[in-house]
């Protein structure tokens, strides 16, 4: 059972609770006063100290009561909120299996008149504090700028006995806003890209993140004198746009030395990526081809290469991990070689239909089978999932159904970590804040109600305007569901589901949302979300007028395009397309209008 399912049973907060309180209830605060002290152990970790400050801050904001923070001593306070393991916890004789909780699990337990929140020293106790604030007291952190902290005259708690662990060891919502340190910590995302410091428990850090062959054996350094280090293609060695010749023992040696140097230079990282470049061109020399044929997949040679490096890493740095990819030409698992225990393989779900749950979509059957095969040869599988439209970050991509079904699916296939790649390079993609929030919640607890998460976000983020925006999302998802329309991460503004009827109804719903927005900040968020519709309309106009418009029509469309881009810039957007500045993208669109 998860915290979200037992809120009503665990906490009754307010005057009614105060008047009907049982003798064993914990009366945490009333009328701006509290008898409780937040107690830390003498050797509290940085994240536990940060958790104490966060608990103090939000309890003050909720109730008006500022609880003191103390380090346990010979004499303990009469009423305590005990954070973490130590003398204070042991004095209460509360049973918590810290070994089972690991680094990130936690327990929230009543020990009347005391409250205990304790877990793994690295992040567990801190996560327990945020779970208490969120799921018991009603706090929400929807985005880095939008939160909901309730105001309560009294806080009275029914007995609590909660134990939680995350469903995935690595949880990364890949959106720019999700990299905010406080947002990531409060939503229990241990993201590599997040700006998480030691006080916030650190993170599952990668270095480098991906596509590292050129860094492992740099062509600029070796290609001139040693072309044999690189792919043999069509009868000759290729030293640009290439991969490595992984059967060459010198390549293995150099790559191994590079990884060991990376570990020395970046000891803060947990995982070091040994992954092929972002293209094909794998080596076709006789030795490499022989291994490929033996293994039934080029990934066999890749894993032999990665395993050799990982074996040396394990000898010198047993706490570090090595990562690689099952992507493009390495997606198919090998017949013979299996990843070592300290290797994480990221299976990339890049060529799938993103509009339907994978197990329910005929276009995704092959990937589901591939997932099944990989989970059969490693207990440490990661997945690289995709949650945006890369050439069109503002494209209204209807993938919430898919996310709600497939994150739990990954758990069923024993996946250990997920990087959900969204608009990682700029703010302002389609429903980025909602997607990041929902992904974070599902990565922690795959049994969470995705629909309830969505509705809670829409209500908290948009207020009264959230209902028509919810109907807009229902409209998009209902269209692709009812008509079995497929789409991927490169879909265009001419996508079939964006029919004239859908566009017209979407406009009506956003008109309604703008009228219901009763706060300037909410209205700004509604208008920002509406930019996705404006994007579809203006780019459709650009394509049509650019192809057959008169000079006057082209000039007018160019002016409207310029105005749209300026609005995006004013909203803080830096990119409309992956790897392309917003002004460079404007020039791409503007080119046919200037002919």
List the predicted regions and their residue ranges.
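Structured mid-domain segments that build the active-site/substrate or prosthetic-cofactor binding neighborhood
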Residues: 250-253, 261, 365-467, 471
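Catalytic domains of carbohydrate-active enzymes that cleave complex glycans
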Residues: 414, 442-595
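Well-ordered, non-membrane alpha-helical segments in soluble/globular domains
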Residues: 256-258, 296-311, 361-372, 398-407, ...
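Acidic, contiguous N-terminal accessory segments
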Residues: 6-12, 17-107, 147, 153-161
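Acidic, His- and aromatic-enriched active-site or binding-groove loops in soluble protein domains
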Residues: 292-309, 340-360, 438-448
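Feature activates predominantly on carbohydrate-active enzymes
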Residues: 51-54, 58-60, 96-304, 314-318, ...
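Loop/turn elements at helix/coil->beta-strand transitions in domains of secreted/extracellular proteins
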Residues: 34-35, 65, 76-79, 113, ...
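Substrate-binding cleft/loops of secretory-pathway carbohydrate-active enzymes
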Residues: 323-351, 394-401, 427-436
């Amino acid at each position: 059972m998860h915290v979200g399912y037992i809120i009503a049973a665990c906490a009754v907060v307010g005057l009614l609770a105060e008047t009907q309180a049982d003798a064993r209830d914990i009366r945490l605060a009333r009328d701006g006063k509290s008898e409780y002290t937040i107690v830390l152990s003498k050797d509290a970790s940085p994240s536990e100290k940060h958790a104490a400050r966060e608990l103090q801050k939000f309890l003050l904001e909720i109730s008006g009561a500022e609880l003191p923070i103390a380090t346990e001593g010979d004499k303990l306070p009469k009423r305590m909120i005990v954070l973490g393991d130590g003398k204070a916890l042991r004095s209460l004789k509360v049973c918590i299996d810290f070994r089972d909780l690991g680094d990130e699990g936690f327990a929230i337990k009543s020990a009347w008149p005391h409250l205990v929140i304790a877990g793994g020293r690295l992040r567990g106790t801190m996560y327990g504090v945020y779970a208490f604030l969120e799921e018991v007291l009603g706090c929400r952190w929807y985005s880095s700028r939008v939160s909901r902290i309730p105001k309560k005259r009294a806080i009275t708690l029914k007995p609590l006995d909660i134990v939680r662990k995350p469903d995935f060891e690595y949880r990364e919502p890949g959106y720019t806003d999700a990299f905010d340190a406080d947002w990531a910590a409060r939503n229990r995302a241990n993201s590599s890209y997040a700006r998480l410091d030691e006080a916030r428990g650190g993170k599952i850090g990668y270095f480098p993140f991906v596509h590292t062959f050129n860094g492992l054996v740099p062509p600029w350094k070796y290609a001139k004198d040693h072309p044999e280090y690189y792919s043999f293609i069509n009868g000759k060695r290729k030293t640009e746009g290439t991969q490595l010749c992984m059967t060459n023992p010198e390549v293995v040696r150099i790559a191994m030395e590079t990884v060991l140097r990376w570990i020395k230079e970046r000891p803060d990282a947990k995982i070091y990526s040994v992954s092929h470049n972002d293209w094909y061109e794998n080596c076709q020399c006789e030795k490499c081809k022989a291994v490929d044929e033996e293994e039934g997949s080029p990934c066999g040679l890749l894993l032999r290469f990665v395993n050799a490096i990982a074996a040396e890493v394990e000898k010198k740095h047993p706490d570090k991990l090595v990562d690689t990819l099952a992507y493009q030409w390495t997606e198919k698992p090998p017949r013979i070689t299996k990843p070592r225990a300290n290797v994480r393989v990221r299976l990339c779900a890049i060529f799938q239909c993103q509009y339907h749950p994978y197990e329910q979509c005929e276009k995704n059957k092959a990937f589901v089978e591939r997932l099944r095969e990989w989970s059969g040869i490693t207990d440490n599988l990661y997945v690289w999932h995709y949650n945006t439209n890369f050439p069109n970050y503002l494209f209204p991509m209807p993938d919430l159904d898919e996310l709600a079904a497939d994150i739990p699916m990954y758990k069923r296939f024993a996946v250990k970590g997920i990087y959900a790649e969204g608009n990682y390079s700029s703010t302002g993609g389609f429903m980025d804040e909602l997607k990041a929030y929902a992904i974070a919640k599902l990565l922690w607890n795959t049994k969470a109600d995705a629909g309830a998460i969505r509705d809670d976000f829409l209500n908290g983020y948009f207020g009264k305007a959230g209902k028509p925006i919810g109907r807009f999302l229902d409209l998009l998802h209902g269209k692709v569901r009812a008509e079995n329309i497929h789409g991927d991460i490169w879909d265009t503004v001419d996508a079939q589901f964006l029919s004239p009827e859908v566009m017209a109804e979407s406009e009506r719903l956003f008109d309604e949302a703008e009228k219901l927005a009763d706060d300037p900040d909410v209205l700004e968020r509604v208008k920002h979300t509406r930019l996705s519709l404006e994007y579809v309309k203006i780019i459709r106009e650009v394509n049509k007028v650019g192809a057959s418009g008169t000079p006057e029509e082209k000039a007018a469309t160019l002016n409207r395009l310029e105005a749209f881009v300026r609005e995006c810039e004013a909203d803080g957007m830096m990119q409309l397309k992956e790897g392309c500045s917003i002004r460079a993208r404007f020039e791409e669109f503007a080119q046919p209008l200037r002919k």
